[in-house]
UniProtKB/Swiss-Prot annotation:
Glycosylated residues in this chain: 218
Binding note for cofactor: Binds 2 calcium ions per subunit. Calcium is inhibitory at high concentrations.
Residues involved in Ca(2+) 2 binding: 227, 251
Pfam families, alphabetized: A_amylase_dom_C (PF09260), Alpha-amylase (PF00128)
Site positions for Transition state stabilizer: 318
Protein name: Alpha-amylase A type-1/2
Catalysed reactions, semicolon-separated: Endohydrolysis of (1->4)-alpha-D-glucosidic linkages in polysaccharides containing three or more (1->4)-alpha-linked D-glucose units
Protein species of origin: Aspergillus oryzae (strain ATCC 42149 / RIB 40) (Yellow koji mold)
Localization in the cell: Secreted
Broad class of enzyme this protein falls into: hydrolase
Keywords annotated in UniProt: Calcium, Carbohydrate metabolism, Disulfide bond, Glycoprotein, Glycosidase, Hydrolase, Metal-binding, Secreted, Signal
EC number: 3.2.1.1
Entry GO terms, CC: cell septum; cell wall-bounded periplasmic space; extracellular region; fungal-type cell wall; hyphal septin band; spitzenkorper
Length: 499
């Protein structure tokens, strides 16, 4: 039986993973598969169970379901998963549906029974650790959730924050340019209000610090994704991050690096929204701007405290899926390659590998099981190949993850970048010409390879030879990404070989 080279390589690399740890330095080398627990996999293994995103109801995904599909995730080369919040939610079916997503919590000391039991969550953690993989859990410290108007909240339903004293006075955010409003007023609306905890109060602060340390300890969690970070005052976060004792990455939903990057001074990392917007715009059409992406790579690298601890993505449950803008598979391949080979920690959202095309919430929260989990889809294989070369480069080059990605070339339709220590660098060439793009040879300078050196293009498994002038003649066709690595360094890796 022929087995894909990336499958052989990834299996060998991950089974041999070292003992687990959960420091920021350890997370630099991870690659994250993000999933909504309710929408990824069911305990019964069904691939036909109905899940109409417009209904906004629980669809039946569970922690046990995730355990049963870890081969599917690990087969793409992911070393970690990020799951949505685990706390008990408001029980009602609101006018906006159920709290299937996990962001409308009411009891932080109980688990969401729709996903399973405490033993199930512990089993998920153990199953990941047995594979050398990490568990990241989503947490919310900013707010609770209530089925009703902000002016008529019954605070007694919240545990342990069971009185109005724990919360900011009711007011909805009207002006997002006013940081005081952003922090002190409420998200939500009068259909589902999100009572905003007053995290300046020691009693609230200490409760959260105790809780997060216990959560991490009880379920052997390796990292946290923190929701709505910009809605809590900055001085709350260092103590929270310290109490967690693991890598924390925060959601600061703002594309301005001058606003977003400073949050990395109060927690380990943030989601890279500054890159998200120019990345999306560069590849969502064949007329996108490479200039803006090129410039933002350099801005984030220079202005953020540590770009190697940011989370790179183009899809999540809050933003429309990439394929909702274009169904061009070549463009989707380029954007996925960027995510995995840029600085920081790659994050791929469940369903992205199957070219899901849901638009705004709730359409972008499709059930992964309805795809049937095929492992031969074009994006599944592309993601596996890109993760494989990244994982391999990390295993061979101790400086790879801290080397700052360097854009070395751009034109109207192309961007090229290099990452890694001299002699072991990966050079990635991305195009937004799309699947109908012409065939041509790009003469690439600045790659840092030596004249006459043989390179392997690890997506298509072809080779090129560096010219006598040091330029690399890169064959481009069909708008596809090219990822180069020194051929001699691949010896024994199984990359670009079959058995």
């Amino acid at each position: 039986m022929m087995v894909a080279w990336w499958s052989l390589f990834l299996y060998g690399l991950q089974v041999a993973a070292p003992a687990l740890a959960a420091t920021p330095a350890d997370w630099r080398s991870q690659s994250i598969y993000f999933l909504l627990t309710d929408r990824f996999a069911r305990t019964d293994g069904s691939t036909t169970a109905t899940c109409n995103t417009a209904d906004q109801k629980y669809c039946g995904g569970t922690w046990q379901g995730i355990i049963d599909k870890l081969d599917y995730i690990q087969g793409m080369g992911f070393t970690a998963i990020w799951i949505t919040p685990v706390t008990a939610q408001l029980p009602q079916t609101t006018a906006y549906g159920d709290a299937y997503h996990g962001y409308w919590q009411q009891d932080i000391y109980s688990l969401n029974e729709n996903y399973g039991t405490a033993d199930d969550l512990k089993a998920l953690s153990s199953a990941l650790h047995e594979r050398g993989m990490y568990l990241m859990v989503d947490v919310v410290a900013n707010h609770m959730g209530y089925d009703g108007a902000g002016s008529s909240v019954d605070y007694s339903v919240f545990k342990p924050f069971s009185s109005q004293d724990y919360f900011h006075p009711f007011c909805f955010i009207q002006n997002y340019e006013d940081q005081t409003q952003v922090e002190d007023c409420w998200l939500g609306d009068n259909t589902v209000s999100l009572p905003d905890l007053d995290t300046t109060k020691d009693v609230v602060k200490n409760e959260w610090y105790d809780w997060v340390g216990s959560l991490v300890s009880n379920y052997s969690i390796d990292g946290l994704r923190i929701d709505t970070v910009k809605h809590v005052q900055k001085d709350f976060w260092p103590g929270y991050n310290k109490a967690a004792g693991v890598y924390c990455i925060g959601e600061v939903l703002d594309g301005d690096p001058a606003y977003t990057c400073p949050y990395q001074n109060v927690m380990d990392g943030v989601l890279n929204y500054p890159i998200y917007y120019p990345l999306l715009n560069a590849f969502k059409s064949t007329s996108g701007s490479m200039d803006d992406l090129y410039n933002m790579i350099n801005t984030v690298k220079s202005d953020c405290p540590d770009s190697t601890l940011l989370g790179t993505f183009v899809e999540n449950h809050d933003n429309p899926r990439f394929a909702s803008y274009t169904n061009d598979i070549a463009l989707a391949k380029n954007v996925a390659a960027f995510i995995i080979l840029n600085d920081g920690i790659p994050i791929i959202y469940a369903g992205q590998e199957q070219h899901y095309a849901g638009g705004n919430d709730p359409a972008n929260r499709e059930a992964t099981w309805l795809s049937g989990y095929p492992t031969d889809s074009e994006l599944y294989k592309l993601i596996a190949s890109a993760n494989a070369i990244r994982n391999y480069a990390i295993s061979k080059d101790t400086g790879f993850v801290t080397y700052k990605n360097w854009p070395i070339y751009k034109d109207d339709t192309t961007i090229a970048m290099r990452k890694g220590t001299d002699g072991s660098q990966i050079v990635t060439i991305l195009s937004n010409k799309g699947a109908s793009g012409d065939s041509y040879t790009l003469s690439l300078s600045g790659a840092g390879y030596t004249a006459g050196q043989q390179l392997t293009e690890v997506i298509g498994c072809t080779t090129v030879t560096v010219g006598s002038d040091g330029n690399v003649p890169v064959p481009m066709a069909g708008g596809l990404p090219r990822v180069l690595y020194p051929t001699e360094k691949l010896a024994g890796s199984k990359i670009c070989s079959s058995s």
